[in-house]
Amino acid sequence: MQLSTQVLERNAQQFSEYKNLLIMNPPENDDLDFLTPEKVLTLDYRVYLSHKNELEELIEFSLSHAPSTLYDGAVVVLPKSKGELDLMLAYIAPMLEVGADIYLVGEKKGGIASASKRLENYGSNSSKLDSAKHCQLWQVSLEEKAKAFDLDSWIKIIDISFNNIDMKVAAIPGVFSFAELDQGTALLMENMFTKLEGRILDFGCGCGVLGAYTKKLNPEIQLEMVDINLLALICAQKTVELSGIEAKIYPSDGWDDVQGRVNGVVTNPPFHRGIGTEYQTTEYFIQKAKDKMARYAPLLLVANTFLKYAAIIEKTFGRCDVLAETTKFRVYKAFR
């Protein structure tokens, strides 16, 4: 059980008074029965899957939830970025009745103390209710009806020109490479193959810039883009539309929802999850790749130089070459 869940559980009596309690951004796998929620919302596909069997229709992987009855309380678990927290609060606030309590819980190392100040946008009486397990629990009462949530107002459009290819890229707070092209992705784009064909998968697509660039260089490919972050999928869809290309964009935890075999993979895979690091997803993705890729299909992967993916790629594919590198990043190439 995660620390934030432990703090919520030790304050379970506090939440027993609510008839319609909303949970936003629950931890993965942790049992939420003690909160008796009316609805649980997540922007993380893996979290959604971890609770789906237990919560069934109570949980939604969505940014379009419209409740039939306003909620009288909400619990928000602190996300990684403050921008994502702002979006989450703006998303749920219109679902709450005036006077409803908003709770924010998170770890101190995740910045809960400074993040709690975001609650002041919804009420002037925010207070710290608990401090334990290296976490804090804050509460505020909604003082006035919140304005309707407008997703488009959170999307920033960035013009990117790379190797004489112009693209418009959509970005939302909380999505990797928000507001600028990161150096790792740029290094992979600089060394992108120009003779790709068939189904090409962009794993951990983020805002969609890598996939869009790959499609621009290889217009005949059938591009597919996957991520577990709903905000990333929304950005990728917008990026594709603005770039005038076509792609199939859908949530998938690694290979789980990718049907059949693909003819190539391009990826700047994630290794952060929440406020920590998590390497297992990418390691498992590489290990499983041989079973999901067609014969002779290329894998092009960029990663920080300190990440030990080369040995896993070599063990899986029999060979791993370094296509390009800087002091911070390395592009690996392998063939099925």
Regions found by a protein language model. Name each.
Residues M1-E56, Q183-T267:
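Conserved SAM/SAH cofactor-binding pocket of Class I
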Residues E60-S62, L129, A170, E224, ...:
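General small-molecule cofactor/ligand-binding pocket signal
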Residues S62-T69, D256-G260:
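Short amphipathic alpha-helix with an adjacent loop that forms part of the alpha/beta core around
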Residues G73-G83, F203-G211, V262-G276:
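Conserved proline-anchored active-site loop of SAM-dependent methyltransferases
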Residues E84-F162:
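N-terminal auxiliary segments of SAM/dcSAM-dependent transferases
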Residues L89, D101-S124, K128-S131, C207, ...:
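Conserved Class I SAM-dependent methyltransferase catalytic core
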Residues E97-A100, E220-I221, A297:
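A short helix->loop->beta-strand "cap" motif at the edges of active sites that frequently abuts
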Residues K133-R199:
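SAM-dependent Rossmann-like transferase core, predominantly class I methyltransferases
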